[in-house]
Amino acid sequence: MPREDRATWKSNYFLKIIQLLDDFPKCFIVGADNVGSKQMQTIRLSLRGKAVVLMGKNTMMRKAIRGHLENNPALERLLPHIRGNVGFVFTKEDLTEVRDLLLANKVPAAARAGAIAPCEVTVPAQNTGLGPEKTSFFQALGITTKISRGTIEILSDVQLIKPGDKVGASEATLLNMLNMLNISPFSYGLIIQQVYDNGSVYSPEVLDITEDALHKRFLKGVRNIASVCLQIGYPTLASIPHTIINGYKRVLAVTVETDYTFPLAEKVKAYLADPTAFAVAAPVAAATEQKSAAPAAKEEAPKEDSEESDEDMGFGLFD
């Protein structure tokens, strides 16, 4: 009987993961190290209506995906990433929005000896409030301290742990003592390892790329292409406008140095022959605009006078 129950559970699990893979075009492969059942329940509640979390044994997930490759060959790209303590977060919503919800559900945690540090830990310079008997912990970690008013004071900021480092016993003990100072260096939650989007698998860092960043990179690429094409004389859509402008400038330069001319070059020649004429023409044009604006102002002034005369027809406030 237990075997039948286990077999039924496996069968239902296979059907569930296949159904989710068919229904949801996008999903995250997430790491679940140090995530407890209570925190997982909180994450599921926060994602309700937007995403579905599915955990399970790696062998079962791989077997279910391999059995479904005939219907969706693109799922094979997921197989190399199913290793370690991982699960799936399926969604139809915006991936960035779901990612932000997962990040919001991280919880601070104390350091444990033997754990892998998920982030850098720096102990700031401060008075720890700890008694002199705890000095040995700081000495073992190479942290410079002094005794100030009967308590240990850290003299300078110290980088205690780097990302990926294994937390030692001394580091864990010190950090747990510093928890009394509201220093909770680690936070745990579902960590996005890979993103699956309609058959494509990519790193979660891609989600940080905004439209503005893409636009800037595109423009930079266009400028680089135009520059290279101009240098080698190869015409492209990016370089042709610059080629035409540069050619026009060269033609103008030739007309200036020779007797050859054309209508568009006449103005350039006139400017070079007498630059002061153009300097005088600009103030004259500005003065003409001011004169044309003055009559309009004069026409508005009599209207205001007539309105004032109408108001003063002879009746006082108390007549």
Curated annotation (Swiss-Prot):
Subcellular locations according to the entry: Nucleus; Cytoplasm
Record's function text: Ribosomal protein P0 is the functional equivalent of E.coli protein L10.
Main location group: nucleus
UniProt keywords, alphabetically: Cytoplasm, Nucleus, Phosphoprotein, Ribonucleoprotein, Ribosomal protein
Biological source species: Danio rerio
Cross-referenced Pfam families: Ribosomal_60s, Ribosomal_L10, RL10P_insert
Any one Gene Ontology BP term: cytoplasmic translation
Region: Disordered, residue numbers: 289-319
Superkingdom of the organism of origin: Eukaryota
The protein's name in its UniProt record: Large ribosomal subunit protein uL10
PTM field: Phosphorylated.
Cellular component terms (Gene Ontology): cytosolic large ribosomal subunit; nucleus
Nucleus listed as a keyword: yes
CDD domains, A to Z: Ribosomal_P0_L10e
Family: Belongs to the universal ribosomal protein uL10 family.
Subunit structure: P0 forms a pentameric complex by interaction with dimers of P1 and P2.
GO molecular function ontology, one term from the record: large ribosomal subunit rRNA binding
